[in-house]
Amino acid sequence: TWFGSETVLGIPAKFIEGGLGNVVEDPFGAGFCLILVGLFFAGKLYRMTLLTISDYYRERYGRVVEVVCSLIIMLSYLGWVSAQVTALGLVFNLLSGGAISIPIGMTIGVVSILAYTLFGGMWSVAVTDFIQMIILVVGLTLIAVFAGNMAGGADKVIELASSRELFRFLPEPSFHDIAFFIAAAITMMFGSIPQQDVFQRVMSANSIQAATRGPVIGG
């Protein structure tokens, strides 16, 4: 779910715009987030047999903190969900050759996701994520091959990217650039640890070994 339509469509544009350092938040920050969850948090949370991450806040800090954190978490999802839905609408629009407008595509995507999630629960999410990831890997690999051939070979693409310093990962040695680089990295790396989407996948594992190893492998 993390590496969905908004990631596939958004990250290439950010890479072209600002290079490798411009995508430190996602996928680098997101990947390290999963590794940290698997190494330090998944086992302890799994043993608590909670339903939501907010349940942990209630047990640890009380009802008021639970409600406040729940509201903050819901608000934090607005931008991410909006990006997912918008990108999904764009995918339908492109695949249909413009026959399906972006708003209609967004509606189709939302209704489809709500339907299989409501009726299938986390099992349906796991199955569809598995299938979608296979499609993404195969599809992006084919796109890379065809695009490279159209550009005259992969070496031409790499040469062009290198000439524009797109493979530069670290920021310029200025306070502004370094601060923004670190802020972007920790937004996903640390900010997504206490979130419901990560938590529910940990709690849905069939064993503590799967709960701890899965995020590390995924990261």
State the predicted function of each range:
Residues 10-25, 58, 101-102, 134-219:
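Loop-to-helix junctions at membrane interfaces in multi-pass transport proteins
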Residues 1-11:
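A generic, lipid-embedded transmembrane alpha helix
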